[in-house]
Amino acid sequence: MVKTVYITGYKSFELNIYKDDAPEVYYLKQFIAHKLKHLLDEGLEWVLIQGQMGIELWSAEVVIELKKDFPDIKLGIITPFIGHTQRWNDKNQAKYTNIIQQADFTESIHHTEYMGAYQFKQADQFMLDHTDYTILIYDDEQEASPKYFKAMLVEFMEKTNYTCDIVTFDELTDFINDLQWSQDQSFE
């Protein structure tokens, strides 16, 4: 039974998404909600993220929205270090502040500002050590920063009984096509 899931994947700019009202964001959020609802039906309690722009913050927004129907779901934001949003523009910082105000738990792995790339690796390892499952939205066809976490995840799974769902663009495309078809049918 999955009690705690870590959701991660592409940063928004790695998907060439620069606005939250882009149609792609809507579909990604619908997909994430779909995945989480299945896990909630099986006893999911916590969703953890590290607070990165893109898949992680969209997932946080989905969790906040799901709380209306699943009030027991909890959102935890565990950042690699303090001040990880300092270089973000005001709009993104305001969005992040709004999300953390609605989170059930917030903490940083390192209680310092950025010191080195090792902080990201240690935060990734923390997530693996403290969750039952990972949803990683990443496709080897579009290589980007999640490739480092994927390598760590695969190695971790080889040594443990940890499980994950690595979501490819094909799976996303199938979901979007099905969603669009069902929405078209509802208008007939």
From Swiss-Prot:
Transmembrane domains' residue ranges: none
SUPFAM superfamilies for the chain: MCP/YpsA-like (SSF102405)
Entry-linked Gene3D superfamilies: 3.40.50.450
Lineage, highest ranks first: Bacteria, Bacillati, Bacillota, Bacilli, Bacillales
Family: Belongs to the UPF0398 family.
InterPro entries: YspA
Pfam families, per the entry: YpsA
Organism, as annotated: Staphylococcus epidermidis (strain ATCC 35984 / DSM 28319 / BCRC 17069 / CCUG 31568 / BM 3577 / RP62A)
This protein's name: UPF0398 protein SERP1017
